[in-house]
Amino acid sequence: MVRVMVVIRIFGTGCPKCNQTYENVKKAVEELGIDAEIVKVTDVNEIAEWVFVTPGVAFDDVIVFEGKIPSVEEIKEELKSYLEGK
């Protein structure tokens, strides 16, 4: 199996919802055992370029969640689907 690297961006200003989203993404990546770079985007101007409501999550340049805390299972499902299409 070819390992595909994915950059996962978490958009948020450090609020509890954004921090929980980060933890859920981290856990999903660990459970799937995938190669991922997880980046916290906290600059308000950069966040505004990507999402209207935080927290937000993007895989590479694709927004997959916005304005909610995705569960670990939701993240895993989206990641698997995304990586199958790469």
Curated annotation (Swiss-Prot):
Domain of life: Archaea
GO MF annotation terms: protein-disulfide reductase activity
Pfam families (alphabetical): Thioredoxin_3
Keywords: Disulfide bond, Electron transport, Redox-active center, Transport
InterPro entries, A to Z: Thioredoxin-like_fold, Thioredoxin-like_sf, THIRX-like_proc
Family: Belongs to the glutaredoxin family.
Name assigned to this protein: Thioredoxin
Native organism: Methanocaldococcus jannaschii (strain ATCC 43067 / DSM 2661 / JAL-1 / JCM 10045 / NBRC 100440) (Methanococcus jannaschii)
